[in-house]
Amino acid sequence: MEVARGENIRKRKFFDMDIPLNKGIKPISYKNIGINTLPKNNMSRKILFKDKISRDSISKDSLAKDNLSKSSMLKDDLTRDNSPKNGLIGKKRSAPLDISFQNMNSSMPSSTQKRTKILDEEIEDQSTSNENSPVIVDLTLKPSYMPKISRITEIIHKMKELNMNRIEDALPSNKKRNEYDDAKNILLQTMEMDEEDYEAENVVIEDSPYLNASLSEDDTDSSIVEVETDYSEEEKESMSESESSSDDESYSLYDSF
């Protein structure tokens, strides 16, 4: 096959080009590369192929097209610079509108302008006066959060006070704590010993003759003391009659039941 030199051939292979093979560089075989796919700039061609492609291996039409495109670009630039500026491109932008408070105040009515001036003066006075004054942080909270936080702060303050009192009066607090522990132990002991004491008291009541309600016959005989009295015969007869009448009444009542 003949080497294509400057002819208008759309596709060809690397081994058809006049690439020197003396330096041991093997051409890429059997890869079809279109000339239009190559970069248009000669420098980029040289970088891409490392000076292995000569001008003779590239068609003259493509180089002519490159030159024409460059010249047309330059002409377009010149015509744009010299053409009348009717479109947006090439126009000088107008300066942005000065949106300031003065312009806004000019559109406001006089009453609002006076108010804004007074407010501005007050703000300036406050800023100048607060330059050297201490910063006061306002810790006011919203009413919805006030109850919970107030309770928490109260609890914290109480805990702090208790801790401070304990630190300041260490010995009295220890004494109070010991007294409280002693009283607690005594109460527990009494609660535990109540049942045992109750059982022991019952045993003592059963054993002791002085506290027992059921007395024996000997005790009754010894405890009863007969006192002799001098009654007349008439009194004795009246006594016996009264006893007999009481017995008859008791029997009659018993029979009625």
Swiss-Prot record:
Q: What induces it?
A: Expressed in the early phase of the viral replicative cycle.
Q: Where is the composition biased (Basic and acidic residues)?
A: 74-83
What parts of the sequence cross the membrane? none
- Quote the biased-composition stretches of kind Polar residues, using this chain's numbering: 100-113
> What keywords appear on the UniProt entry?
Early protein
Cite the residue spans of the region called Disordered. Answer: 74-115, 209-257
Query: Which ranges are annotated Acidic residues under compositional bias?
Result: 216-236
| Family per similarity comment | Belongs to the asfivirus DP238L family.
- Protein name per the record: Uncharacterized protein DP238L
Its organism's taxonomic lineage begins at: Viruses, Varidnaviria, Bamfordvirae, Nucleocytoviricota, Pokkesviricetes
